[in-house]
Design a protein with these regions (language model features):
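Structured interface patches
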Residues: 1-166
Length: 166
């Protein structure tokens, strides 16, 4: 899978009231806290740019799938998301996404990355009924129930100190 197109030619848009539309499919490396986009799950990008009174309106629609590891059972799942973005950018002003409108090409990979990162959770749970891993043997309790006897938890974490011969 090729990388998603993130550079676009906007040379003609500031000289007219025209509108430019692009569509691109591909891969972009985004990783965060056990989540990551993969080459097997393409990102679909639709973008429309329009010049309106010395500002550039960007309307962006993003469909993507990322792999996320469950915080309880450590299973990897594919999470599908859709994200929309609309904002106005002025040619001679700086912006939060480091997009330079002074040149004939704009690079929007930072904008796409931020939209994807905002959808990735720090702690992902595969479902509400996830039982997680066994604290004794480490087996996934969603797949099988452990047969070993349960460990008797003592009242205090310091109660094992009473067993020391001093």
């Amino acid at each position: 899978m090729s990388f998603i197109q993130t550079k676009y030619d906007i040379s003609g848009i500031f000289n007219s009231k025209s509108e430019i539309s692009f569509e691109s499919n591909g891969h972009l490396d985004v990783k965060y806290a056990g989540n990551k986009t993969t080459e097997t799950n393409p990102i679909n990008l639709r973008i429309q740019m329009k010049n309106v009174h010395e500002k550039l309106e960007i309307d962006l629609k993003l469909r993507f799938t990322f792999e996320s590891e469950c915080s309880r059972c450590l299973d990897v799942n594919n999470v599908k998301k859709e994200k929309s973005f609309f904002d106005d950018f002025y040619k001679n002003q700086s912006n939060d996404y480091d997009i330079d409108f002074a040149s004939d090409e704009i690079e929007i990979s930072s904008l796409i990355s931020e939209l994807i990162l905002n959808e990735m959770k720090l702690q992902y749970i595969c479902n509400n009924e996830c039982k997680g891993l066994c604290s004794e043997c480490g087996n996934n309790q969603n797949l099988a129930t452990c047969k070993h006897p349960k460990k008797n938890l003592k009242e205090s974490p310091f109660s094992s100190l009473t067993e020391l011969d001093l």
